[in-house]
Amino acid sequence: MKVTKKDMIYEGKGKKMWSVAEDENLLIAEFKDDLTAFNGIKKSSEKGKGALNNKISTQLFHLLEKNGIKTDLVETINDTEQVVKKVKIFPLEVIARNIATGSLTKRLGIKDGTVLPFTLVEFCYKDDDLGDPILNDDHALLLGAVKDKNELENLRQTAIKINKILKEFFATKNLKLVDFKIELGKDKDGNILLADEISPDSCRFWDAKTNEKLDKDRFRQSIGNVKVAYEEVLRRILS
C-alpha cells in the first residue's frame, strides 16, 4: 500500500500520528522507541522497542479480527509504521484484569498475584493533568465520555471478549495475560473499533511457570532487559 505522510496531527507517549495525503479517512501510526511510566514522570528510550511493538500489535490485531473484533488496522507498511482507519477515540482507557497487581492491589488491598474470579473491567478518564482517574459508570456519563449506558456496556463487553480471545491464545504460549488497557473508538460510520495497540507497553505478561515479568513493568520497576522481554513475547506469539 503506497501512502504519503502529510502532517503530524498528534504525538503521544508511544506513537506519532500522521495524516495521509491520499485519503483523509486514513492515518499513519508511527511507533516510537520512547519508554514512559507513571504518567510520564519516568522516561527513557529503548532502541528497537517501537518496531517490536508494531510487530506484536499487528499479530494480535490480526488474531482478534479473525475472531470477530473490528480494529482500525489497515496495513503494516514497515518496521515502525501502520496505516490505520481514522477513528474518534473515546476519552477512556478501558482496562481488563485477570490477576491482581499494580494499582489494583494498592487501591483495594488485594494481595499481589491473586487470580480474580472474573474479568474485572475498569474505565479511566484520559487526562494526564488529572492522573487518568478511575471512573464509575455514572462518572463516564456525567463527563460525556459515552452517549449512554448502552454504549458504555458495549465497551465493557468488547473488552471482555478481547480478553477471552487473548487470554486463551497466550495460555498456549505459556504466558499469563495479567491485565491490559485498550483504546476504543468510532469510525465514520459509527462502528466501534479497537484502536491504538496491544503490546507489552499496554499489557502485563507473566511467564506461566516462573511469573517472570515480560512487559513494561521491567522499566517501571527498573528490572532491566526491556527489549529482551519484548523480543521473547514476540518469539512466543510467532511460535
From Swiss-Prot:
InterPro entries: SAICAR_synt/ADE2_N, SAICAR_synt_PurC, SAICAR_synth, SAICAR_synthetase, SAICAR_synthetase_CS. It holds the Pfam family SAICAR_synt. One of its GO terms (biological process) is 'de novo' IMP biosynthetic process. GO terms for molecular function: ATP binding; phosphoribosylaminoimidazolesuccinocarboxamide synthase activity. Coiled coil: none annotated. Pathway: Purine metabolism; IMP biosynthesis via de novo pathway; 5-amino-1-(5-phospho-D-ribosyl)imidazole-4-carboxamide from 5-amino-1-(5-phospho-D-ribosyl)imidazole-4-carboxylate: step 1/2. Keywords: ATP-binding, Ligase, Nucleotide-binding, Purine biosynthesis. It is an enzyme of class 6 (ligase). SUPFAM superfamilies: SAICAR synthase-like. Disulfide bonds: none annotated. It catalyses: 5-amino-1-(5-phospho-D-ribosyl)imidazole-4-carboxylate + L-aspartate + ATP = (2S)-2-[5-amino-1-(5-phospho-beta-D-ribosyl)imidazole-4-carboxamido]succinate + ADP + phosphate + 2 H(+). Its EC number is 6.3.2.6. The keyword Zinc-finger does not apply. The keyword 4Fe-4S does not apply. HAMAP family: SAICAR_synth. Belongs to the SAICAR synthetase family. This is Phosphoribosylaminoimidazole-succinocarboxamide synthase. It comes from Campylobacter hominis (strain ATCC BAA-381 / DSM 21671 / CCUG 45161 / LMG 19568 / NCTC 13146 / CH001A). The lineage of its organism: Bacteria, Pseudomonadati, Campylobacterota, Epsilonproteobacteria, Campylobacterales. The gene is purC.
